[in-house]
Amino acid sequence: ELTLWSSEDYLILVCSQVWLQLDKDVCHMKILIIDECFYTRSGVNTYLNNSTSLNLRDVPTVEQATSTIQDFNPEIIIVNLTQYCRFGGHCPLLEHFLRCCDQAKVYIYLDAAYPFSETPIPLTGSVSILAKKHLPELLQSLSRISHDSGKSHLSCPASLFSPQEHKVMCYWMTEMPNYRIAKKLNISDSTVYSHKRHITEKIKVRNRLELCFIYNVFKYLY
C-alpha cells in the first residue's frame, strides 16, 4: 500500500535527519594523544572518555602519529615532546611531524618545571606549550568544549615573537655575545638585552638554558 506524505510530514522527516546528522558530527570531535608512557596515555584517555563529545585515539611515538594524523584527521593533538628538547641539532622527524599537524590545534607538553605558566602559552595561532604538571587543567578545559568551539581554535598563523626577537633568539641560541648580535642586526647592545628579556618573559623561562631546552622543539614552527 502506497503511503502518501504531506509536505509538512516530509519537512519534519528531513529536518529530523539533518539534526541527527548534526548531532552525530558534534559528538565526534577527534583528539590524538601522543606519549611514550602507557600510563599517561591511559590516564588521559580515561579522563577524556567521560565526555561523550570526544573521539579519542592514542599512539606512543611521533613517528606513528605522523601516519595516524593522515588517517584520523584529529582536530586536537596533545603531545609530549620532552625527548626532542634534548636534541640540539636538526631533527627531520620532528619537523615533518609538526608540518603534518597544520590542520589541528596542538598542545605540546614537557616533563619540566617550565614554562612557568598555569595556562598553555600560544607559540603560534595553532600551537601552544605547557609544563606537564598543568596537563590536568588542560584536559578539564578540553572535556568541556564542543565540536564547533574546537574548530574555532584554528586561526591564522601568528607568532609569539616579533621578527627581530626571532633573529636575536636564533643568534642567542648559538651563544653569540650581545655586541656581535647588535652589530649583525644594526641595533644597540641595550636593545639586544631588552629583546632577550622580552623573549624569556613571553615564553615564561628564567634563563638561556631553559629557553634553549624549549627552543629545540618550537624552532620548527617559524
Give the location of each predicted region.
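Helix-turn-helix DNA-binding segment
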Residues: 152-191
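Residues within the DNA-recognition helix of helix-turn-helix
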Residues: 195-198
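Hydrophobic aliphatic residue packing
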Residues: 31-34, 106, 168, 181, ...
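Hydrophobic residues on short alpha-helical segments
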Residues: 166-170, 200, 212
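Basic, Lys/Arg-enriched C-terminal extension of HTH/homeodomain DNA-binding domains
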Residues: 201-222
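N-terminal regulatory/sensing modules of transcriptional regulators
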Residues: 1-151
